[in-house]
């Protein structure tokens, strides 16, 4: 039995509360997914080189972006814990300290990407045409780092205090801005220059800047700044607060960076199989993005609620919450994966009109769907471990899995040179290991006494 207060009969969070936190996250991520979908749809009609370059550039950019998002996720865990403790006035200083750090960090990363990419990428991307287009893409995409890092700390604040409605409408504005700019800058419409793959990058960066302004405006107008300690900007400059945030966030940054770095290594390995294989993998990446953001929204919402439960002193209800989130996620994601399996050609046709590419990509759809099904449990359980505050345990689990993942990519792809579908099967092994290790830790680890 569930109550209207957001609690069920056991004192844990109800399905209604889970939905109220998760669905705005889900909607915002669906909107953001449209950015990648429109990039693929537009660039797929430019050339396979443009499609491959956007894939390589996006993953390379993501490798740096996750450093900031990992830091912000650590801040979110702290914010959720303080919110559960009802220590509201300490939340603002956490946001300020995290925000100041991320602004400086983004500027350093932008400079690094600008000056290092022409030296690094030719050594790892075999195709000269894809390499040149990737560098062109990054020259414009890197400016979005500042905007997405600032936005990340705002998202952490709203997810941490379980007020996620703002995520929805800000994402709608960002996506519509991106679609219009994409069409104009890729193909030279609306009087804008025809920039091709660089236009897709610039459109994304501008759209992210617009989203950042939405968060700033909403926070100034609709949030009780005094309640959450946003009037304590001087105390936020205290190094001890940044140190506290860093103790939690540092390991999330490392885990996120290494995880995406390994994923980039996977793309580099596939690129060595040829431009067609990379194009197939890029289609799979785009299609797997939709189930992933569904899964990610449930995992993020669940992690926030777990942090709040821990702050309320209700660690004994964490497993009860995990089971509810898992049931909810499987009910939502599984029908989509069944559709992928039953209608692969129809789904692929949304992204490309190349019949040969569609034919070669069909086997990939089956493998990708199986991996995504396992990812439902894997990602939710992994974020549950992080939500308890057991950051080092989560990082240890990830590093162990990634070591095995790299071995499988090295041997299974670079040495054996399989089909794209067989190459993607390493995801199945990775998700299975994540499920196993997370369950073992949640049953036998000492996370219930974790203090932050």
Where would I find each of the regions flagged by the language model?
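Short runs within selected transmembrane alpha-helices of multi-pass transporters and secretion channels
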Residues: 72, 76, 141-159, 167-178, ...
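Interfacial/gating helices of multi-pass transporter permease domains
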Residues: 43-62, 94, 128-133, 197-198, ...
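N-terminal transmembrane alpha-helices
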Residues: 9-41, 45-46, 62-74, 78, ...
């Amino acid at each position: 039995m569930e109550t209207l207060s957001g609690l069920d009969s056991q004192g844990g969070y109800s399905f209604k509360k889970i939905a109220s936190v998760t669905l705005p996250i889900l909607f915002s991520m669906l909107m953001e997914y449209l950015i990648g979908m429109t990039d693929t749809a537009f660039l797929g009609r430019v050339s396979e080189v443009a499609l491959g370059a956007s894939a390589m550039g996006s993953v390379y950019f993501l490798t740096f972006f996750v450093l900031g998002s990992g830091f912000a996720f650590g801040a979110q865990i702290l914010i959720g814990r303080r919110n559960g403790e009802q220590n509201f006035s300490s939340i603002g200083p956490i946001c300020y300290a995290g925000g100041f750090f991320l602004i400086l960090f983004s500027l350093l990363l932008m400079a690094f990407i600008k000056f290092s990419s022409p030296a690094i990428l030719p050594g790892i991307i075999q195709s000269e045409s894809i390499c040149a287009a990737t560098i062109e893409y990054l020259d414009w995409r890197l400016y979005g780092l500042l905007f997405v890092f600032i936005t990340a700390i705002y998202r952490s604040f709203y997810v941490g205090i379980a007020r996620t409605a703002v995520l929805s409408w800000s994402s709608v504005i960002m996506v519509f801005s991106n679609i219009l700019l994409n069409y104009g800058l890729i193909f030279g419409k609306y009087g804008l220059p025809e920039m091709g793959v660089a236009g897709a990058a610039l459109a994304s960066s501008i759209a992210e800047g617009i989203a950042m302004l939405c968060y700033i405006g909403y926070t100034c107008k609709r949030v009780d700044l005094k309640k959450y300690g946003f009037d304590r900007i001087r105390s936020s400059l205290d190094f001890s607060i940044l140190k506290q945030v860093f103790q939690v966030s540092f390991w999330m940054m490392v885990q996120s960076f290494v995880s995406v770095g390994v994923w980039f290594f996977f793309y580099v390995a596939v690129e060595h199989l040829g431009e067609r294989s990379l194009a197939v993998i890029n289609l799979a990446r785009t299609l797997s993005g939709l189930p992933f953001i569904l899964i990610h929204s449930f995992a993020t919402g669940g992690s926030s609620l777990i942090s709040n439960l821990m702050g309320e002193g209700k660690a004994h209800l964490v497993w009860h919450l995990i089971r509810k989130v898992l049931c909810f996620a499987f009910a939502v994601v599984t029908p989509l994966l069944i559709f992928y399996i039953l209608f692969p050609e129809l789904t692929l046709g949304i992204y490309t009109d190349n019949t040969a590419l569609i034919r070669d990509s069909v086997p990939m759809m089956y493998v990708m769907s199986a991996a995504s099904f396992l990812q439902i449990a894997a990602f939710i359980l992994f974020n549950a471990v992080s939500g308890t505050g057991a950051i080092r345990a989560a990082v240890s689990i990830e590093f162990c899995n990634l070591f095995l993942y790299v071995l499988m990519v090295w041997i299974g792809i670079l040495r054996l040179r399989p089909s794209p579908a067989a190459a993607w099967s390493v995801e199945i092994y990775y998700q299975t290991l994540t499920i196993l290790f997370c369950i073992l830790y949640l049953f036998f680890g000492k996370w219930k006494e974790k203090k932050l």
